[in-house]
Amino acid sequence: MIILVPAEQRLSLEGRIRVFELVPDPVTGDERLHRHGYSYCLDLAGGILAEYEPDELDQVTNSIGEPYAVYVSCQSMDAARTFLRDVLPGVDGLVDTNHFEILPASRFLALMGRHPEWDWRRQPSTDLQ
């Protein structure tokens, strides 16, 4: 998943994540997080934006302006939900599920609250309405 915020909020989002005591991954250069029994690999450099299609990047830019992105990889949906519940409250940005949806963070959190077992890899948010 990818968390996107306006570029001017980069330090705020990074601060929320760095408080969890990340450690460098000597192999990938990314950062690792071990929290609540889960393991995460994070790319805080924002390079994931280079992988966006032009229309996707336009959608993000039209919504939040120039974006900053954090890529988060983890082992399970439970891990993903836990991370997002820890990080997203109060974030004014977007969540890219990496499964064809980019949703406002507040809406994403609301959907997770109403549908605690939601697996966005298999079920689009429009099926939850």
Feature names for model-found ranges:
Residues 1-129:
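Acidic (Asp/Glu-rich) sequence patches and key acidic residues
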